[in-house]
Amino acid sequence: MRFLPVFIILLLLIPSAPSVDAQPMTKDDVPLSSLHDNAKRALQMFWNKRDCCPAKMFCCQW
């Protein structure tokens, strides 16, 4: 029981710790937002093609 408050305090401190990613960007780094947008676009294309069939050609976006 004595360790419970210490454990809770440690759990609260973990998210506020400095991140390892907090380093200056170099010219070769890609922003995470760009990677997120690319993944979102790829998933959207996959979703559109998943429901595509010859009977529903109007839904296909090639």
From Swiss-Prot:
It comes from the Eukaryota. Keywords: Cleavage on pair of basic residues, Disulfide bond, Secreted, Signal, Toxin. InterPro entries: T-conotoxin. Contains 2 disulfide bonds that can be either 'C1-C3, C2-C4' or 'C1-C4, C2-C3', since these disulfide connectivities have been observed for conotoxins with cysteine framework V (for examples, see AC P0DQQ7 and AC P81755). One of its GO terms (cellular component) is extracellular region. Residues 1-22 form the signal peptide. Belongs to the conotoxin T superfamily. This is Conotoxin Lt5.3. It comes from Conus litteratus.
